[in-house]
Amino acid sequence: MGVAKPTKRQSADVARLGAMSSMTNSIAFIGGGNMASAIIGGLLSLGTPAAAIMVVEPHAPARAALLQQGVLAQPQAGEFLDAAALVVWAVKPQLFQAASLPVRAHTRRALHLSVAAGIRTESISRWLDSEQVVRAMPNTPALIGKGITALFARAEVTPEQRSRVSQVMGTTGGVIWLDTEAQLDAVTALSGSGPAYVFYFLQAMREAGVAMGLPAEQAYALAVATFIGAGELARVSSEPAEVLRQRVTSAGGTTHAAITSMEQDNISAGFVRAMQAAQQRALAMGDEYGSA
């Protein structure tokens, strides 16, 4: 019986694996979902060679999408990960520990960057047998390069490694570094879950517009434009949100009537409670998925 010849794709993958072995700045992604794809897209747009990026993704449709971007996508971990200087963990938190088992033998010298919600660096360090761990909390606007990511590094991470992480996550938007890991749970509640709050209010404004006689499409367009414009105004202004709000709120006017109604309904206090619930869930996820 003859030996089957490798396919063109298999031959190309072997060649690329050999090329990566000589690279000192290769990046591996464990998980190839939306956030990983956003980071990869940002890296490629800024000139990172596709040959320097490899992804472990078990699902064939996701691998196919990644291959269209020109990066190497494999269904499982292997020796090709030995070439990675940075490993980005973009897996669901409940899958992190199991996913780490076949990877850690190949990546002990790498810097590890986790975007998995809730999993603390202590757990990640233990699972991967490495102290070079950075934890990130991005948000979904990263998918269009408009995100914000908060970062925390363990003490053993060098300034050069922190700079590299800033470069990588900066491809998806802004970055900030935190002093303590506990602050990441607050960030999760604020900006991590924050886009959902915005969408929630957009939905409410659309429904209110429809109830007042506007077509749904127009109501939604007005709401979205208002959020974009107000957000940009807040970004460029040196004045706090309270002052900006007061400037729109004339005594006895329409905005004053709306704000008074919201204050009577304790909207602000309810919003704080909602964010605290998100923070507590982030804490619980760290205990639930990272205790082993």
Residue ranges and their predicted role:
Residues 124-132, 148-186, 199-236:
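Internal alpha-helical scaffold of NAD(P)-dependent oxidoreductase catalytic cores
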Residues 10-75, 82, 127, 210-211:
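NAD(P)+-binding Rossmann beta1-loop-alpha1 motif at the extreme N-terminus of oxidoreductases
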Residues 21, 224-292:
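NAD(P)-dependent Rossmann-like dehydrogenase/reductase catalytic/cofactor-binding core
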Residues 133, 183-189, 241-246:
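Short pre-catalytic strand/loop immediately N-terminal to key active-site residues, enriched for Gly-Thr
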Residues 2-10:
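Extreme N-terminal basic, low-complexity initiation segments
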Residues 40, 54, 60, 69, ...:
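Rossmann-like NAD(P)(H) cofactor-binding subdomain of soluble oxidoreductases
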Residues 53, 80, 215-222, 244, ...:
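Small-residue helix-packing motif on alpha-helices
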